[in-house]
Amino acid sequence: MDHDDLLGAYRRLRLLREFEERTRLEFQTGQIAGFTHLYAGMEAIAVGVCEHLSDEDKIISTHRGHGHCLAKGCDPAAMMLELWGSTDGLCRGKGGTMHIADFSRGMLGANAVVGAGAPIAVGAALAASMTGASWVAVSFFGDGATNIGSVYEAMNLAVVLKLPKIFVIEDNG
């Protein structure tokens, strides 16, 4: 990475942290309904991975998906509108904080079920393999998902079929 790449990565790190700080404040004042799980403190993981992905590559996130969305290039204003429940949000206000997605950026969605993104991302990787597409699928999940059977089944299938798949385990606890 050259100086400009490093500066761009730093700016994305700051964007992720500032977005999470704003999200925390909006949640505390009741502007964001339901639950919210912040990604603050883990920004370097998402930025470090997504920095090396193409626009065509796909990602699947967790219930802590804001950072992954932003690192993949999703629009922060549209994301905040989504968290507020606005019909102008990324998912028309229906996805909220734990189910946010932006297919146009390769963000196939966040999933509130622990470990559920790994098999979904393997399905995306299988689609790439079967159609001859050149993109890879990345699933992010926390260390708590490493005791979920479907995560290991997804890993096994990805290896057996030699799929274009990356598993990112985040120590978030």
Q: Which role fits each region the language model picked out?
A:
Residues E21-L25, T29-L161:
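Cofactor-binding active-site loop characterized by glycine-rich and histidine/acidic residues
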Residues M1-G8:
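Charged, compositionally biased N-terminal leader segments and the immediate start
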Residues I169-G173:
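Thiamine diphosphate
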